[in-house]
Amino acid sequence: MHQVVCATTNPAKIQAILQAFHEIFGEGSCHIASVAVESGVPEQPFGSEETRAGARNRVANARRLLPEADFWVAIEAGIDGDSTFSWVVIENASQRGEARSATLPLPAVILEKVREGEALGPVMSRYTGIDEIGRKEGAIGVFTAGKLTRASVYHQAVILALSPFHNAVY
């Protein structure tokens, strides 16, 4: 059984990681542990590189905390231009897989508050009245009318980041 450490306590991220690992390695093949670790970047990262650095830092911090695991996984959400997206970073003892999620264009009224220094989650919670929306459907769920959620978009990126771990060509 694979021991997988999720460098997050966010239920939407954990759900995406668990589902993707079960799809790739088989139902019941993984034990998931969740840990809160620092990203080393601002609460609301801007740009692809800062966001990816946050995910890489979370993986490194999770590895230091639980070095006996088989996989360490981090999902870091950020803002790039006028859109929100995330980076997924997965490592095992010998390799790394990374993938960037789909992007969601954000309305100007939301971007204005984020650019003033607020994190997207609290801005969206105020806008929607949904407490801790970032731990639930997120802006993605709101602006896609529930057709997608944070977890569903993260799930796809986790599947992509897992590619090196089950394909010999890597």
From Swiss-Prot:
It is an enzyme of class 3 (hydrolase). Substrate binds at residues 8-13, 68-69. Gene3D superfamilies: 3.90.950.10. Its EC number is 3.6.1.73. Pfam families: NTPase_I-T (PF01931). Homodimer. This is Inosine/xanthosine triphosphatase. It comes from Escherichia coli (strain K12).
